[in-house]
Amino acid sequence: MLKANRLSIYAIGKIKKKWIREGINQYKKRMPDLIINESKSFNIDNIRVNNIIICLTEEGKSFSSTELTSLLLNFKNKKINFLIGDADGIPSDIKDKSHLLLSLSPLTFPHELARLILVEQIYRVISISNGSPYHRA
């Protein structure tokens, strides 16, 4: 079973669009333990060495929601950190240190919208792992 307290999002920049911020806040109410860190740049040294690092990038691998659930469950009790870059993406040196490059879709999304989609998918993954009826395949 996945819990939000094992998952963190590290993102470059703050959400400027009110409707996206409101959407993220709706999911945060359902997952108050989910940590979302917004900053001007990534400091990979602040992420513990034994944590799993997943970079969201267009060249990453795509998964269905159930496949992503299985993948995250395989990380057992490790903390999982999702990294989302700004409009320029994630620097290659950080991608090189990640455990997985993840693509949300073959479509390209603005980074703010990608953050909302990721938060929804995290909620969905937690719901799937808990047997909640939220996800209907």
Curated annotation (Swiss-Prot):
Name the catalysed reactions.
Answer: pseudouridine(1915) in 23S rRNA + S-adenosyl-L-methionine = N(3)-methylpseudouridine(1915) in 23S rRNA + S-adenosyl-L-homocysteine + H(+)
Alphabetical list of Pfam families matching this protein: SPOUT_MTase (PF02590)
Q: Record's CDD domains?
A: RlmH-like
**Which EC class does it fall in?**
transferase
Question: What SUPFAM superfamilies does its record include?
Answer: alpha/beta knot
The record's section on InterPro entries has: Alpha/beta_knot_MTases (IPR029028), RasGAP_dom (IPR001936), RlmH-like (IPR003742), tRNA_m1G_MTases_N (IPR029026)
Gene Ontology CC, one term:
cytoplasm
Where does this protein hold S-adenosyl-L-methionine? 56, 85, 104-109
Q: Give its localization.
A: Cytoplasm
One GO MF term on file is: rRNA (pseudouridine-N3-)-methyltransferase activity
Question: Record keywords: Transferase included?
Answer: yes
Primary location class = cytoplasm
E.C. no: 2.1.1.177
Q: Which UniProt keywords apply?
A: Cytoplasm, Methyltransferase, rRNA processing, S-adenosyl-L-methionine, Transferase
Q: Which HAMAP family match?
A: 23SrRNA_methyltr_H
Q: Quote the function comment for this protein.
A: Specifically methylates the pseudouridine at position 1915 (m3Psi1915) in 23S rRNA.
Complex and partners? Homodimer.
Per the record, the similarity remark reads: Belongs to the RNA methyltransferase RlmH family.
Q: What is this protein called?
A: Ribosomal RNA large subunit methyltransferase H
> Which organism is this protein's natural source?
Prochlorococcus marinus (strain MIT 9515)
